[in-house]
């Protein structure tokens, strides 16, 4: 699932914009650890035009930025890859309720090139695909 598909899924009234309430659902789907304050602050930061709603472009850039920050944090050695063996820790730190076995299965499916690592695109597909 792409960031645009996530946008469409959570745009409940199909008006082409996400309200703060709709965005809250997205944020909590990514991680239940976000506080209300975190969500409001993040929403305000990515609402580039300041109209109190997120359009698809604002949302997509937000998701990519957020996931890039998580990816960089998890990419301890900075080589642009996260070992598949560490995905369980990464996913549970995002609040996902995976067993190690489930995590391994999801990583195998996301590891398109089969190298045993998740690059950013594979990581993004894994995280977004679980929403």
UniProtKB/Swiss-Prot annotation:
User: Is Calcium among the key words of this record?
Assistant: yes
Kindly list the GO molecular function terms attached to this UniProt entry: calcium ion binding
Q: Describe the function of this protein.
A: Potential calcium sensor.
In this chain, Ca(2+) 3 is annotated as bound at: 111, 113, 115, 117, 122
**Ranges where the EF-hand domain occurs:** 1-33, 34-69, 70-97, 98-131
Q: Where does Ca(2+) 2 bind?
A: 47, 49, 51, 53, 58
Q: What is this protein called?
A: Probable calcium-binding protein CML34
Gene that produces this protein: CML34
Read off the SMART domains from this record: EFh
Q: Which domain of life is it from?
A: Eukaryota
User: Any idea which positions bind Ca(2+) 1?
Assistant: 11, 13, 15, 17, 22
Per the UniProt entry, what species is this protein from, by scientific name?
A: Arabidopsis thaliana (Mouse-ear cress)
SUPFAM superfamilies per the record?
EF-hand
């Amino acid at each position: 699932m792409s960031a645009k598909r996530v946008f469409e899924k959570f745009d409940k009234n199909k008006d082409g914009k996400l309200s703060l309430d709709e965005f809250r659902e997205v944020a909590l789907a990514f991680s239940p650890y976000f506080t209300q304050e975190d969500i409001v602050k993040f929403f305000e930061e990515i609402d580039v035009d300041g109209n109190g709603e997120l359009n698809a472009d604002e949302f997509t850039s937000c998701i990519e930025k957020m996931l890039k920050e998580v990816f960089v944090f998890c990419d301890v050695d900075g080589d642009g890859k996260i070992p598949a063996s560490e995905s369980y820790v990464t996913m549970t730190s995002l609040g996902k309720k995976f067993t190690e076995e489930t995590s391994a299965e999801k990583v195998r499916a996301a590891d398109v090139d089969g190298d045993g690592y998740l690059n950013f695109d594979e990581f993004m597909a894994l995280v977004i695909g679980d929403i």
